[in-house]
From Swiss-Prot:
The complex is composed of two ATP-binding proteins (NikD and NikE), two transmembrane proteins (NikB and NikC) and a solute-binding protein (NikA). It comes from Shigella flexneri serotype 5b (strain 8401). ATP binds at residues 36-43. Its EC number is 7.2.2.11. One of its GO terms (molecular function) is ATP binding. The gene is nikD. Its main location: membrane. This is Nickel import ATP-binding protein NikD. Keywords: ATP-binding, Cell inner membrane, Cell membrane, Ion transport, Membrane, Nickel, Nickel transport, Nucleotide-binding, Translocase, Transport.
Amino acid sequence: MPQQIELRNIALQAAQPLVHGVSLTLQRGRVLALVGGSGSGKSLTCAATLGILPAGVRQTAGEILADGKPVSPYALRGIKIATIMQNPRSAFNPLHTMHTHARETCLALGKPADDATLTAAIEAVGLENAARVLKLYPFEMSGGMLQRMMIAMAVLCESPFIIADEPTTDLDVVAQARILDLLESIMQKQAPGMLLVTHDMGVVARLADDVAVMSQGKIVEQGDVETLFNAPKHTVTRSLVSAHLALYGMELAS
């Protein structure tokens, strides 16, 4: 399994250019946070990595490398990169139980799909009574439960990398904290490389090792999390950090 995945000069276009020459490097055991405002190109960059661009959007330049060798996004999805989606309610088939979802995920990747394996993954993400959870349909579960189930399926993939696209969006404060605890636990136990897409600098401060800031389809600043919080350079980065510090009655040094 690869130890590093590199996005090199990725460019995306629809009716007009959307992402301009984005380069990112994911490393096993480290969390790279991709931050920026809505419409900055964060989720599109993730979609390009996985080969799931929306209709009408195409990649016009760039490549993806695994340990320095060019690789197709389709060869990465699921096997080498697991995904935690932004909206879990739309990610599950409403006609299938959690057992069907989890089992099909395992079978598609050639992983064990026995009930003991599925139960262990569900228990690992803190969902109680795994036997009952496996019988549930998506509409019978809360947003927080569905997000945990999605993380359980990422655990089942045993992929060396994870893309987590706004994993705490639309969750209440308690559910958000639990999801962050889970992601932190996964990093400690499995040490995958993680691309964490978020607009929440509190999430960045807690989980990230490195940060890349996007604005208008470009990476405008990139560095380790400590440097970025203590000495942000770009106006977009300074605005994000200042807004975060203001929540605690603090100000960014001029």
